[in-house]
Amino acid sequence: MATEEKKPETEAARAQPTPSSSATQSKPTPVKPNYALKFTLAGHTKAVSSVKFSPNGEWLASSSADKLIKIWGAYDGKFEKTISGHKLGISDVAWSSDSNLLVSASDDKTLKIWDVSSGKCLKTLKGHSNYVFCCNFNPQSNLIVSGSFDESVRIWDVKTGKCLKTLPAHSDPVSAVHFNRDGSLIVSSSYDGLCRIWDTASGQCLKTLIDDDNPPVSFVKFSPNGKYILAATLDNTLKLWDYSKGKCLKTYTGHKNEKYCIFANFSVTGGKWIVSGSEDNLVYIWNLQTKEIVQKLQGHTDVVISTACHPTENIIASAALENDKTIKLWKSDC
């Protein structure tokens, strides 16, 4: 169920974009975004764990400790369907590039591949010996990468559901896995304090990123252009790395993150922002270049565990834990 936020007249009028006299091709990042709450999506009966927009921009998928995946309209928050089949809670969900398939990672030690339109489970991926915590398709969507509390990273064949490679990746639970934009590399992060870059084809570790300190790494992903890595650590810090040089370029702070694996994002549809949830129940938005906090979104009543940025519009989805259980859709003019 989506409830819509009603705006006072004056604010709605003020939110109309004004025509710009100098509409140049490459716009500099605006000073600040103005994300406002548009819809609250209620339906999950336990903590929400992950939210992801479909690559075609039509849908939002959510996963939860209630063992369910729910599909919602990306623009209006309208509930579309529930997808069920896992025996225990789900920690992550991810879309295929054509927006037709989903993969989910569950505490039942399996991943499942789903046909979204029918809601049917096409394959169950078995092999991990502990909770599966994170998953992603490669851009070609013929492979899936998963990370588990069994400390391994696995690469799976989408068509057959067979495990192609098991990487003895880390010495603690794996918190995130992500392919770069051509699918040639995988990045993984772990509570062992490391980020590792893997060659997809060979399964070889190409690079290990180590900071001076080594707090648990709770999330990692490649930037859209594939040159950088965004990594979250459980010392209330997000860092942007040039991984080829092994150098930290930017540090983003001000939020609270010491306990949970909170997703972070690059927002690139308008201004260039970094977006993350936080343990103080807020969504934080930073200017990517200047590292300053440009907006904090208030409304959730528990830890904001997951945020997602729409592929083409200035829309953020956020999701929160057990005391809240809702998903919120926020929109900005820039």
From Swiss-Prot:
Residue(s) at site: Important for interaction with histone H3: 107, 133, 263, 322
Region (Disordered): 1-31
PROSITE patterns with a match to the protein in the record: WD_REPEATS_1, WD_REPEATS_2, WD_REPEATS_REGION
Alphabetized Pfam families for the sequence: Beta-prop_WDR5
Biased composition (Basic and acidic residues): 1-12
Consequence the record notes for mutating residue 149 to A: Significant decrease in interaction with KMT2A
A Gene Ontology molecular function term of the record: histone binding
Outcome of substituting residue 133 to A: Strongly reduced affinity for histone H3. Significant decrease in interaction with KMT2A
Reported impact of residue 263 to A: Strongly reduced affinity for histone H3. Significant decrease in interaction with KMT2A
N-acetylalanine found at: 2
WD repeat spans: 43-82, 85-126, 128-168, 169-208, 212-253, 256-296, 299-333
Subunit comment: Interacts with PAXBP1; the interaction is direct and links a WDR5-containing histone methyltransferase complex to PAX7 and PAX3. Interacts with HCFC1. Component of the ATAC complex, a complex with histone acetyltransferase activity on histones H3 and H4. Component of the SET1 complex, at least composed of the catalytic subunit (SETD1A or SETD1B), WDR5, WDR82, RBBP5, ASH2L/ASH2, CXXC1/CFP1, HCFC1 and DPY30. Core component of several methyltransferase-containing complexes including MLL1/MLL, MLL2/3 (also named ASCOM complex) and MLL4/WBP7.
Family designation: Belongs to the WD repeat WDR5/wds family.
Name of the protein this chain belongs to: WD repeat-containing protein 5
Organism: Homo sapiens (Human)
Gene giving rise to this polypeptide: WDR5
